[in-house]
Amino acid sequence: MFGQRQSMIVYLHSLKHAKILRKYGNIHYISKRLKYAVVYCDMEQIEHMMQKLNKLPFVKKIEQSYRPYLKTEFENSRPDRAKEYDYS
């Protein structure tokens, strides 16, 4: 039903225009102090949306999130000491 989503961080000159970003995706978070918004959209449309957003006059820059491309399954480098001892 839902496709893969990816976030992009949109840095703004002014937060006055932050509501306009709703047309381009789901707004997850808006930082008032640092003047950025985290916007989610489909992975297939991310490049197209970034080009559209770059044309807007109130957008400083856009960064794409690389979280979908990172490995999130970690291996333990040290074995657990409690499992080494046999208490039976």
Curated annotation (Swiss-Prot):
Annotated Gene Ontology cellular component terms: cytoplasm
Localization of this protein: Cytoplasm
Protein's UniProt keywords contain Zinc: no
Main location: cytoplasm
InterPro entries: DUF2129 (IPR016979)
Keyword entries, A-Z: Cytoplasm
Keyword Cytoplasm applies: yes
Family: Belongs to the UPF0298 family.
UniProt cross-references to NCBIfam families, sorted A to Z: PRK02886.1
Entries under HAMAP family matching the protein: UPF0298
Name of this chain's protein: UPF0298 protein BA_4142/GBAA_4142/BAS3844
Organism: Bacillus anthracis
